[in-house]
Amino acid sequence: MTTQQPVAVLGGGSFGTAIANLLAENGHQVRQWMRDPEQAEAIRVNRENPRYLKGIKVRPEVEPVTDLTAALEVSELIFVALPSSALRSVLSPHIERLSGKMLVSLTKGIEAQSFKLMSQILEEIVPQARIGVLSGPNLAREIAEHALTATVVASEDEDLCQQVQAALHGRTFRVYASNDRFGVELGGALKNVYAIIAGMAVALDMGENTKSMLITRALAEMTRFAVSQGANPMTFLGLAGVGDLIVTCSSPKSRNYQVGFALGQGLSLEEAVTRLGEVAEGVNTLKVLKVKAQEVQVYMPLVAGLHAILFEGRTLSQVIEALMRAEPKTDVDFISITGFN
């Protein structure tokens, strides 16, 4: 891949647009595909994505397109920023065009029916593609505004990682590499659940000690579950684990945090989602994660507690009381306590 060869970004949302701008700043011609012709025309004419990144200028090297076939045919590196629900329907008709190309997922989610992550779905759709994921503490608007940011590209394909680093790395955006694709991607999906809990804690003015406890125990739960599924626990000490968890659990810009904050103010889940205007990923992830944790017998008390509040009619005070009465475990799962006297 050279800077003369176009790069494709699939999806017209905030993160896809932020990544498209970064690529353009680094000298790439970018084909940003979106379904909506009106959105594409608005970006083409006004150089702005008013629906998702209002006030951010889209660079002239970014060409918004609605012809997916044309965008895929000219690109070897393709960033996939599609909603999880649209992944199969959009890409399945283009298997031959995608074969052998580099597909990098930007979407943080879990498919409910299969408990598959987005890169696993890409692998299923296009077995001959080269697959990677990009994840980390990456709020789209801050990237677009050139706040200093770091991310992780993860793949078993070292050359893919190097090409993504070369394409995106810039003066305000640093790209690290990992070979733990599953762990990096799982961290990005799981942290959305805990952002809901964090938002509730802030709305209820629970204090800094409480927020710190919640984030730390959330990291323990995420890591415990991920290891049960084959991920490397060390991944969760990096940007895609604790880094993403901190920004999502502490930023009012996070949709999942906003839902939790509304719940903490006394709104129902339906009212909270209505206020947000869209479903927060953490709500759907919570449902499938609760079932999966029970299935594989992984201890996840925060997940169970939030599920009880949102879907089982329990109150927050009841759940907190149960959590605080539970038998204390060891602080860090992966440190032996056999040396205790």
Curated annotation (Swiss-Prot):
Return the PROSITE patterns for the record: NAD_G3PDH
Gene Ontology molecular function terms on file: glycerol-3-phosphate dehydrogenase [NAD(P)+] activity; NAD binding
Q: Which reaction does it catalyse?
A: sn-glycerol 3-phosphate + NAD(+) = dihydroxyacetone phosphate + NADH + H(+); sn-glycerol 3-phosphate + NADP(+) = dihydroxyacetone phosphate + NADPH + H(+)
Q: Where does sn-glycerol 3-phosphate bind?
A: 108, 136, 191, 244, 254-256
Alphabetical UniProt keywords: Cytoplasm, Lipid biosynthesis, Lipid metabolism, NAD, NADP, Nucleotide-binding, Oxidoreductase, Phospholipid biosynthesis, Phospholipid metabolism
Residue numbers binding NADPH: 14-15, 35, 108, 140, 255, 279, 281
Q: Say where the protein is mainly found.
A: cytoplasm
| Any Pfam family matching the protein | NAD_Gly3P_dh_N
Instruction: List, alphabetically, the InterPro entries matched.
Output: 6-PGluconate_DH-like_C_sf, 6PGD_dom2, G3P_DH_NAD-dep, G3P_DH_NAD-dep_C, G3P_DH_NAD-dep_N, NAD(P)-bd_dom_sf
Q: Where is the active site?
A: 191 (proton acceptor)
Q: Identify the Gene3D superfamilies for this entry.
A: N-(1-d-carboxylethyl)-l-norvaline Dehydrogenase, domain 2 (1.10.1040.10), NAD(P)-binding Rossmann-like Domain (3.40.50.720)
| E.C. no | 1.1.1.94
Compartments, as annotated in UniProt: Cytoplasm
Specify the pathway.
Membrane lipid metabolism; glycerophospholipid metabolism
Its BP terms in the Gene Ontology are: carbohydrate metabolic process; glycerol-3-phosphate biosynthetic process; glycerol-3-phosphate catabolic process; glycerophospholipid biosynthetic process
Keyword Protease: yes or no?
no
Listed under GO cellular component are: cytosol
> What does the protein in this record do?
Catalyzes the reduction of the glycolytic intermediate dihydroxyacetone phosphate (DHAP) to sn-glycerol 3-phosphate (G3P), the key precursor for phospholipid synthesis.
Q: State the similarity comment.
A: Belongs to the NAD-dependent glycerol-3-phosphate dehydrogenase family.
PANTHER family linked: GLYCEROL-3-PHOSPHATE DEHYDROGENASE (PTHR11728), GLYCEROL-3-PHOSPHATE DEHYDROGENASE [NAD(+)] 2, CHLOROPLASTIC (PTHR11728:SF1)
Q: NCBIfam families this protein is in?
A: PRK00094.1-2, PRK00094.1-4, PRK00094.2-4
UniProt-recorded name of the protein: Glycerol-3-phosphate dehydrogenase [NAD(P)+]
Which organism's genome codes for this protein?
Pseudomonas syringae pv. tomato (strain ATCC BAA-871 / DC3000)
